[in-house]
């Protein structure tokens, strides 16, 4: 390994206060226009907005150079919408729509009481302003929610691509639950892109001494 390189100075602006990587994992985009892009989720706040915003650092040259993508809150501000306090984030990849099309990404956002989901159509460089709350993915209200994990599963389940999500599914940091979400196609948007939704079909509560 080479010596580690402190990257804050290249991306942390003078307005930013906290600037840190989100717990969990980064991903490498597997399909589509941005295949091979490395994504590292992070979150930050600033003097102009005390709540957290989520974004990704991305690299298209195996980590030689990095770029800071925008946050869904940037899109919300541009659209005249209020920014939303975002906690730690994780990213998963949706099924491919074609080699020359950027594969959609979903950002799972930690927030008090539940999980928000944002969508990127350009490999994480920008995000749509909408961050709907998934009603199934409950989370603690205190502490601004709780750390969560979500990954793409390596094989289809019930014939569909799937993700695995884990968090404290209660109003407190308890009831640790793993869920399997089947990825469904739910029509298309105004630009002809597929609307992907999750069917949280299976779950398992983690209990001490058993699984």
Language model: regions and residue ranges:
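Asp-box/BNR beta-propeller blade signature and adjacent active/binding-site loops
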Residues: 1-211
């Amino acid at each position: 390994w080479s010596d580690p390189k402190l990257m804050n100075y290249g991306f942390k602006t003078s307005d930013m206060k906290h600037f840190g990587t989100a717990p969990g994992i980064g991903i490498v985009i597997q399909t589509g226009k941005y295949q091979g892009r490395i994504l590292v989720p992070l979150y930050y706040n600033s003097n102009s907005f005390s709540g957290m915003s989520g974004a990704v650092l991305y690299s298209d040259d195996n980590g030689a150079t990095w770029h800071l993508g925008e946050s869904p809150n940037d899109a919300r501000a541009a659209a005249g919408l209020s920014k939303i306090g975002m906690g730690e984030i994780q990213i998963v990849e949706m099924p491919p729509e074609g080699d020359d099309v950027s594969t959609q990404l979903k950002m799972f956002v930690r927030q008090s009481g539940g999980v928000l989901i944002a969508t990127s159509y350009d490999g994480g460089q920008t995000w749509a302003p909408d961050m709907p709350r998934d009603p199934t993915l409950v989370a603690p209200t205190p502490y601004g929610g709780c750390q969560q994990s979500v990954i793409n599963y390596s094989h289809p389940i019930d014939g569909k691509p799937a993700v695995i999500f884990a968090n404290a599914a209660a109003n407190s940091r308890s009831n640790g639950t793993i869920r399997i979400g089947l990825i469904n196609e739910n029509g298309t948007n105004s630009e002809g892109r597929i609307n992907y939704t999750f069917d949280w079909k299976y779950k398992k509560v983690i209990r001490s001494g058993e699984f």
